Amino acid sequence: MKLILQLCAIALIGSEAFAQSDSLASEKIPFDGMDQTWQNGSDRRDSSVLETKYFKGSVMLDANYTYSFNNPIDNTVVGSTALARNNEMQVSFVSLGGEFNYKNSRAKITTQFGTRSVVVPRNDYSPYRGQYQLNNVYRYLSEAYAGYHFKKWYGINVDFGMFMSYIGLNSYFQCENWEYQASFTSDNTPWFFNGMRVQIFPTKKLKIEPWIINGWQSYGKFNTMPGLGANVTWCPNEKIKLLTNNYYGTDAAGLPNRKRFHSDNSILVRYYNQPKSNRVSKIAFSLTGDFGLEKGGGVNGLKTDSIKGPAQNFISGMFYNRVWFHQNKFAWTIGGGVMTNPGRYLVLYPTGDASPLPNPNNPTTTEGSHPFSANPGDQFKAWDCSSNFSWMPNQSIEFRIEYVHRNSSVPYFAGRGGVTSPTGFTTSPLPSDWKPDLVKTEDRIIFAVLFRL
């Protein structure tokens, strides 16, 4: 009798294990079997050591030291969401969190601490509509959403909350990007959305993802209409990735008749792959082009009109090529981009006494007494180029050194005098004859340590 019970138990366990493996085998996973670790803006790890049945943990740390050859006396960086301080070691981003799943329910929470918890929220004007300081409410979250997974085709995910934007190709997490200081196409477009998305995977190689969101990288809404958009990503094979992001909304505060359209399009190609080689082991490039405009409410998109207003648009592009060496332990990246943005509606505004953003202590006035002009008709053109070298001893850590040159058509970057005060300290009074020192060019070196587990 005892032997029979033992045999029954073995049979039951075996049948359960077979059922589980059969269930896993029958589950359709989008992009399954495709190596996407080489892609600019994607996770370079092939697995996670913090993954369990119900939870996949995440720990990230991004620390940097940067030196601008302009050497501003206030150690302040202007025109970047990756960097905040010159000539100092700073922790830019610390994140703890992970993905939860249980019986098709799903959620993700990713925190953010460090300089980015100030640098990124400052660019959102929507918290000044109404009360409750949304920029403080959300500043320590980079992602926070919950939803449900439907087992249709290769999966359908419906999520509500704050999630990452794909516009501009680059990931918000620097450990996923080829370059540290992103070109204007990426740095001047959204990092996050707050709203609802539906991820539809009709085939193994295709994702269609519509959004209904509060607005263009905004915690709240600027007007009545929500932002509408979608991402389409297609990988015909593991060597090629094509994606397009398109957006429509009203993102000029208090101007509901001013409509914004934006189209962001990228192609990534891995054109050499010898992963076991101790010489060149992989080569790939990414190319991104953006086109957008605002029309109505005193501006006229592509063409200046004496009645409808000046042209207001955004045209940009960026290209990067990356070469990996010695079984992908080392990599060299070179690239850059261009941008034109009449009306300056996507320019990252200078900080300090040059800031045109509302004064947090008195929002009826600008933060700076010499605000950077961002009015309809104001012209802005810029270009940049960069090169970096990375050492990646394993998939969890990367050491990177990067050189960046940036140029603008108007004074924009922090010069030697900085943007704070004659002494560089906020405690010093501002003389009547002093003004922020903005210049047209910037050259800098960046050293970064990027950790991910």
Residue ranges and their predicted role:
Residues 18-71:
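N-terminal periplasmic/intermembrane-space "pro-region" immediately following the signal or transit peptide
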Residues 22, 30-31, 83, 120, ...:
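Outer-membrane beta-barrel pore domains
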Residues 36, 70-84, 118-143, 149-234, ...:
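Surface-exposed coil loops of outer-membrane beta-barrel proteins
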Residues 43-57, 103-107, 151-156, 205, ...:
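Short loop/turn motifs that connect adjacent beta-strands in outer-membrane beta-barrel proteins
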Residues 50, 63, 98-102, 111, ...:
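Residue-level signature of outer-membrane beta-barrel architecture
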Residues 50-54, 66-91, 422-428, 433-437:
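Surface-exposed strand-loop-strand hairpins of Gram-negative outer-membrane beta-barrel proteins
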Residues 59-67, 109-113, 160-164, 210-214, ...:
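Transmembrane beta-barrel strands of outer-membrane/channel proteins
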Residues 65-73, 104-106, 115-121, 166-170, ...:
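Gram-negative outer-membrane beta-barrel proteins
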